[in-house]
Amino acid sequence: MSVLDDVTEQQFEQNFNAWLDSLSTGATPTPVLTETGTVTEVADGVAIVSGLARALADELLVFASGVHGIVLDLEPGRLGIILLGPSEQIHLGETVYRTRKVVSVPVGSALLGRVIDAMGRPRDTLGPIDAIAEHPIEAEAPSILNRTQIFRPLATGLKAIDAAIPVGLGQRELIIGDRQTGKTSIAIDTMLNQARSDVLCIYCAVGQRGDAVARVIRALKDGEMLQRCIVMSAGDEEAPGLSYIAPYAAMTMAEYFSAQGQDVLVIFDDMTHHARSYRELSLLLRRPPGREAFPGDIFYVHARLLERAGQFGADIGGGSITTLPVVETQAGNLSAYIPTNLISITDGQIYLSPQLVRKNQFPAVDLGLSVSRVGSKAQNRTLRGVSGNLRVTLSQFEELEDFARFGTRLDDVTRARLARGSAVRTALRQAERDPMSALEQLAVLIAAMEGLFDQFNEQKINDAMRLVRDAAQQQLAVIEQRIIDNQTLQDDDHTLIVNCAQKALSIFDQPATNTK
């Protein structure tokens, strides 16, 4: 007897109808549409792709070889792509795929203490990065209504800057100067000084040699600041596309922390290499060159990056992003295209003079050509009373110094003013990796302005500054509290500092003991 003999015709019909219903209501496979293009040209760092008519500007593409690229030029039947990997891996006729995404990088506290590339991939030996999320590198700058006034100082630990060219949290202050004038050293010392605060740091090296980046990492390790820093490196040996996107990636990481209410310091070292990378890519893509062969939108490229910095309101986290972009000049030419662009975008500049370098004046900050347009409002009131007299004293000294070169006979008053100015300028010298607290800066500058260093030579002034710094830390707790409370310095406080410095320097007045 067959099994079918036990199934009635009615049951069979019911089962058959149920099977048909399941087919009609079940999921049916749908075709997957994949848009592809073809590589028609390859150059160093760029590729030309045909097809992909629906690709969007700044969209991330993937080549069949695994290399990624970004759409930079959109033309009928032709896409200009900047490569984020070695162009040697790409060949003519290779297939290119759309991702319908933009370039994104990991964000979060897991990046602190790590060395990464422009895509957020680890370059150290600490293993993979467990990031919280990925954010696109391009973002709209916060509106005016989402910003607040810059009202808090960023302490660099450098006397010449904190006293005369103060920087505020949320400010964009340009560091500008020729090669080998100490631009990166100022950036490193500023990061190291944040060990006294809660500011997080991001160092973005664009076009720097590997040994230069290694020195920065070593300095941060020695200063116990690496665990609160992110070091991003996009060297000259890598694809120029990575150098182009690196500052935007660093800013995206900073925006994550500022949205959590934290203060972030971002160093772009340096924007000259960034501009050159963008010029190289633009020329290879046959974009019309402009002044100094830079493309016409180079100002916008830098402005849209730096406008993302600022002091933000509580509605978007209440944090801040302070940027210190570095730019290199040629023979002190401040009127070159990229330097003038960045000077007009930023809130001030710290100019490092080659003439001061030749005089062994480090940091070689030229106070006459340096300015902070908003930082003075955020400067500590205790230091504010010193900064005005400091600038006047140095400017008068430089005028007299030029006059004295003619060999004119000088009277006693002029010689005294020259001695005072020379002592004050020497007092502004500061060794690398030796950041000073606000109290130490105040004590040293007041001692110099009051003429306590006038009779010393350069070596003795260095020793005298160390004595004054130590004495201030031990005896001026009241003044330190005034600095913390952001109070104005009183006459009695000024006298207290002078007396403390005089007592510390009295060791130079003691006769040497004769030990036989």
From Swiss-Prot:
Annotated Gene Ontology cellular component terms: plasma membrane; proton-transporting ATP synthase complex
Q: Where does the protein end up?
A: Cell inner membrane
Q: What is its EC number?
A: 7.1.2.2
Q: Which InterPro entries match?
A: ATP_synth_asu-like_sf (IPR023366), ATP_synth_asu_C (IPR000793), ATP_synth_asu_C_sf (IPR038376), ATP_synth_F1_a_nt-bd_dom (IPR033732), ATP_synth_F1_asu (IPR005294), ATPase_F1/V1/A1_a/bsu_N (IPR004100), ATPase_F1/V1/A1_a/bsu_N_sf (IPR036121), ATPase_F1/V1/A1_a/bsu_nucl-bd (IPR000194)
Major localization listed first in the record, in broad terms = membrane
**PANTHER family per UniProt:** ATP SYNTHASE SUBUNIT ALPHA, MITOCHONDRIAL
List the protein's name. Answer: ATP synthase subunit alpha 2
- Species of origin: Nitrosomonas eutropha (strain DSM 101675 / C91 / Nm57)
